Regions:
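Metal-dependent nuclease catalytic cores that hydrolyze phosphodiester bonds in DNA/RNA
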Residues: 1-131
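Mg2+/Mn2+-dependent nuclease catalytic core
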Residues: 116-183
Length: 183
């Protein structure tokens, strides 16, 4: 469950669903580390707030209106970080998701595990890795949380980022069907 191992040198020796996306869209970028973006930071904070809220204090947040301000540039030390008003919006999303009885039940109730890494052979002798956001053993489901700026475009996002192959790989790694909860 160590992020350093999963995302570091050890983890890079195995294929992941992200690799499928890169190979399909830009094979020359295969193996190149992903650049942080505000959207990735937002999604990461949302996941942490839902799945590992005790780790939120490790995430740097700057109280500035934009990333172009002097305050932000001085405090960020050249690293992309979240702005306080972005965190405020994420907290509303967290509250909204957990206010939904069905979603909350799937995420919080019963025999559930969070941030579960998996490793195994999916295609012949090729090892694949995946990290399940939530495994609900009572419902026999893998639950993946997705944030989106536009729910109407989710079907295109699912195609672009190959949610179908993610579900296939995770089903093989963890043995349960996968559902996506998007907000």
């Amino acid at each position: 469950r160590d992020d350093e191992l999963y995302y570091g040198d050890f983890g890079r020796q195995f294929r992941s669903n992200s690799d499928i996306s890169v190979l399909l869209s830009n094979p020359l970028a295969f193996g190149v580390p992903t650049t942080k973006t505000p959207a990735l930071l937002t999604g990461g904070y949302f996941h942490t707030a839902i799945l590992e809220p005790d780790k939120l204090n490790r995430i740097k947040v700057i109280d500035a209106s934009t990333r172009n301000t002097k305050v932000y540039k001085e405090m960020s030390e050249g690293e992309l970080t979240l702005l306080q008003h972005e965190v405020d919006k994420i907290e509303i999303l967290v509250d909204t998701l957990l206010a939904n009885e069905t979603a909350r039940g799937l995420i919080r109730d019963g025999d559930v595990e969070y941030e579960v890494p998996g490793l195994g052979k999916v295609f012949s002798d090729m090892y694949w890795k995946g990290k399940a956001d939530i495994i609900n053993h009572d419902e026999k489901l893998i639950i993946d949380l997705k944030t989106t700026s536009d729910l109407d475009k989710l079907q295109w996002t699912a195609k672009k980022y190959n949610y179908d192959s993610q579900a296939f790989v995770y089903k093989n790694l963890f043995g349960y069907d996968m559902i996506f909860i998007a907000i």
